[in-house]
């Protein structure tokens, strides 16, 4: 598990080089070394959050080298409301990965929870409706869909690594 540093709207360093606690910061080489990636971001106005965008924008060397081509990727997000931009956020996260030649793993409608959800979950990836205060727990359906997505990613990565 990795995270990305925060970015600032002012011209100054916003984060230490190494986090004091929690997941270590992702580095571009982490993408090169993995056989599959699950990439997540909170939704900001229907887009991925700026720190993830900044990180992905810094992967030009990997794009030029083609080092991420053929790797599977799955996506997940969380929004404040049901119509808060889950699908557009997941789509915005797909774009740089497709430019890298990565293979997007989504959720098929054979997942019953995807057909019946009144909360999070899309064919583009797993999602959670956190509520405007951010305090809504992950529903059972959201949890099952996230697990199904992780399982699909692992299965695809294993098959491609053979």
Per-range role (PLM):
Residues 1-68, 121, 128-162:
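N-terminal beta1-alpha1-beta2 submodule of the flavodoxin-like/Rossmannoid cofactor-binding fold
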Residues 69-122:
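Short, glycine-/small-residue-rich phosphate/pyrophosphate-handling segment
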């Amino acid at each position: 598990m990795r995270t990305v540093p925060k970015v600032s709207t002012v011209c100054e360093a916003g984060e230490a080089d190494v986090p004091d606690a929690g997941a270590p910061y992702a580095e571009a080489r982490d993408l090169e070394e993995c056989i599959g990636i699950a990439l997540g971001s909170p939704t900001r106005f229907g887009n991925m959050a700026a720190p993830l965008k900044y990180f992905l924008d810094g992967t030009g060397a990997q794009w030029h080298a083609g080092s991420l081509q053929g790797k599977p990727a799955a996506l997940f997000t969380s929004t404040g409301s049901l119509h808060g931009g889950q699908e557009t956020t997941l789509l915005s996260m797909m774009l740089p990965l497709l430019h890298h030649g990565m293979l997007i793993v989504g959720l098929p409608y054979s997942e019953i929870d995807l057909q019946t959800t009144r909360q999070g979950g899309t064919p583009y990836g797993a999602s959670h409706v956190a509520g405007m205060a951010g305090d809504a727990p992950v529903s059972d359906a959201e949890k099952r869909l996230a697990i199904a997505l992780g399982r699909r990613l692992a299965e695809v990565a294993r098959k491609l690594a053979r």
